[in-house]
């Protein structure tokens, strides 16, 4: 009888597990690998901020799961129930579609995370997010829609409100989103003769005393100077209190009139975990031991954003980054293989090679193996490293072509509202809840 390994989640962690298992059991048909995800593709999220800015085509940073994982049975479906007692998963292609049951011997929980709005009034309703391809394409269309609207509005105050874009969160996602968005909106303004440069405003709101707290203070200070020098208004030690769609209220009592709030200020584990019989810590993440196995649940592993994994080098929780997720995936796959073959599992341990953050317009910061870089060379490193990590030769070539064209031609300002509606996304002027993965 075949040994059934089922992976729930097709992000960095889930695909890393499946890919490693395929290599470990390449010539062993007795091991069946199944991956369930609500999408049939994975997104290379480090490049996601370049999609709303028009630097990259959306489909060029995704890779089809079926093409990447040829030995894995990929099921595009939403998981409805995970019954750890019966070792079964109930899922369906959609909420209204017929359900099917998948049984497992080994279960891998790679469910990822969703955006954390911290219960702030109006934020979940009005804020946009940057966690999925749909988020990125919707943001692109939303921004162009605001320019088109502002170009027709004779009221200067109304124009400024329409063309003020607030990004919440000064981590990697927030800084890169603000930098790319700033480059895009500054360049787009030249196509709208009724608008003035002073009408456009990009603000980055961060509760900490410095942006990019994951890198050194020197690189953080460089990033701050670069963003401010390019027109991004960086508000440090500032918290957002609420959003009503017409303004963003700050905790100090001030308000920023705007119709665009992009939220990158935190994540929480996938709420599907609440219905699964596994131990969870105070933050809602699945508790795991040093081998990434769930204590007291035979054959169940958890990793990535949904798992409470301790970084052995620092003693702190592992950050929700692709580097850690991929390395965890390899360890989980090897420990499943060890369990099947009667071997001993190995503990997870990883020291990240470095951190990189793009600041737009051919500048970045990088901290690699103790060395620190900033400016053009760091930007070149950022692009080179992520291009190498992008799955698939075809995608690499397409991204290289996009970047080459971006050197010589202006970015696209086509308004795709009709296409957004046709795909079933939220309307461009209405924010939507993030997808749960």
Stretch-by-stretch model annotation:
Residues 18, 183-186, 323-350:
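Internal hydrophobic alpha-helix adjacent to the cofactor/substrate pocket in enzyme cavities
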Residues 125-155, 246-249, 255-327:
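FAD-site-proximal beta/loop scaffold in flavoenzymes
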Residues 13, 112-115, 178, 267-269:
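Short glycine-rich anion-binding loops that position phosphate/pyrophosphate groups of nucleotides
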Residues 1-81, 165, 175-215, 262, ...:
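Beta1-alpha1 glycine-rich phosphate/pyrophosphate-binding loop at the start
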Residues 6-8, 102-112, 132, 240, ...:
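Short hydrophobic core segments
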Residues 1-2, 73-168, 184, 262:
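FAD-binding core/adjacent interface of flavoenzyme oxidoreductases
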Residues 32, 72-89, 182-290, 294-296, ...:
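A Rossmann-like FAD-binding core segment of flavoenzymes
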Residues 334-437:
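C-terminal, flexible cofactor-proximal segment of oxidoreductases
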């Amino acid at each position: 009888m075949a040994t059934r390994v089922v992976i729930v989640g097709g992000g960095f962690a889930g695909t890393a597990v499946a890919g490693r298992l395929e290599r470990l059991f390449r010539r062993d048909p007795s091991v069946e690998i199944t991956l369930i995800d609500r999408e049939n593709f994975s997104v290379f999220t480090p490049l996601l901020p370049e999609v709303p800015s028009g630097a990259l085509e959306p489909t060029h940073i995704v890779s089809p799961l079926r093409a990447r994982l040829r030995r894995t049975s990929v099921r595009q479906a939403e998981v409805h129930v995970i019954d750890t007692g019966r070792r079964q998963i109930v899922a369906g292609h959609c909420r209204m579609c017929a359900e099917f049951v998948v049984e497992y011997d080994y279960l891998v929980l790679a469910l990822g995370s969703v955006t954390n709005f911290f219960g702030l009034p109006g934020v979940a309703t009005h804020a946009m997010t940057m966690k999925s391809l749909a988020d990125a394409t919707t943001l692109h269309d939303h921004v162009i829609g605001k320019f088109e609207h502002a170009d027709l509005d004779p009221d200067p105050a109304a124009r400024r409100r329409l063309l003020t874009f607030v990004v919440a969160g000064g981590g990697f996602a927030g800084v890169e989103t603000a930098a790319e968005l700033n480059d895009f909106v500054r360049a787009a303004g030249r196509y709208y003769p009724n608008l003035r440069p002073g009408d456009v405003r990009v603000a980055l709101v961060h509760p900490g005393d410095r942006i990019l707290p994951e890198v050194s203070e020197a690189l953080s200070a460089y990033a701050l100077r670069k963003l401010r020098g390019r027109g991004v208004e960086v508000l440090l030690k500032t918290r957002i209190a609420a959003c009503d769609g017409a303004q963003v209220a700050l905790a100090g009592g001030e308000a920023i009139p705007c119709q665009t709030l992009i939220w990158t200020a935190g994540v929480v584990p996938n709420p599907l975990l609440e219905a699964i019989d596994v131990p969870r810590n105070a933050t809602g993440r699945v508790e795991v031991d040093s081998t990434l196995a769930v204590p007291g649940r035979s054959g169940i592993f958890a990793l990535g954003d949904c798992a409470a994994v301790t970084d052995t080098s620092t003693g702190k929780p592992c950050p929700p980054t692709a580097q850690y997720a991929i390395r965890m995936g390899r360890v989980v796959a090897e420990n499943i293989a060890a369990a099947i073959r009667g071997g001993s599992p190995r503990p997870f341990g990883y020291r990240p090679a470095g951190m990189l953050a793009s600041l737009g317009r051919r500048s970045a910061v990088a901290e690699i193996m103790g060395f620190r870089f900033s400016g053009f060379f760091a930007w070149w490193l950022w692009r080179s490293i992520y291009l190498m990590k992008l799955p698939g030769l075809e995608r690499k070539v397409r991204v290289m072509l996009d970047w080459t064209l971006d050197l010589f031609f202006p970015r696209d300002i086509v308004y795709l509202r009709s296409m957004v509606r046709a795909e079933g996304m939220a309307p461009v002027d209405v924010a939507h809840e993030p997808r749960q993965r």
